[in-house]
Amino acid sequence: MYTFATICYLCSLNVAFTGHRNYLEVKNEQLRKVVDQFISEGYTTFLCGMAEGFDIAAAEVVLSLKTDYPQLRLLSVIPFEGHDMAMPNAEWAERYRRIVEAADEVVTISQSYNVNIYRLRNDYLVDNADAIICYYSGNVRTGTGYTVRRAMKKCLRMVNLYADSYQIQFFG
């Protein structure tokens, strides 16, 4: 059974975030501009995988824009219950909790940790996205690499903020 919130995001244009944990928050202004561009094109729902680094910074940018764009929705996609306890320090855990509290919907992939849980979370992000905003270095042996490759196979629109200049790309 779908909730009203789930039905709303199934009918909207959705953007998922994926990126490395070593994200440089100095790029937040670029990130904000890209999110603004997607909003101007009618994208209203943003999915965040809730990892430290890029994911959490991206969710915070979306939440900061909700004052100007009340139609925005943030979905926190949590890999498993208690994921916040896996954060590297108290600051990340607190930022994580604030995002979960402010999110319009929280999707929990599993009640407990298992070896495939991050891949399943990444699959959920790609399967429910029309576009991807990423911070991807090109290292294919990472969760971000897996997610980007999967998004490319699905021909999703993609913006990579890793380089100093970025462009919107289409794959297919």
What are these regions (language model features)?
Residues 4-172:
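Acidic/glycine-enriched connector segments
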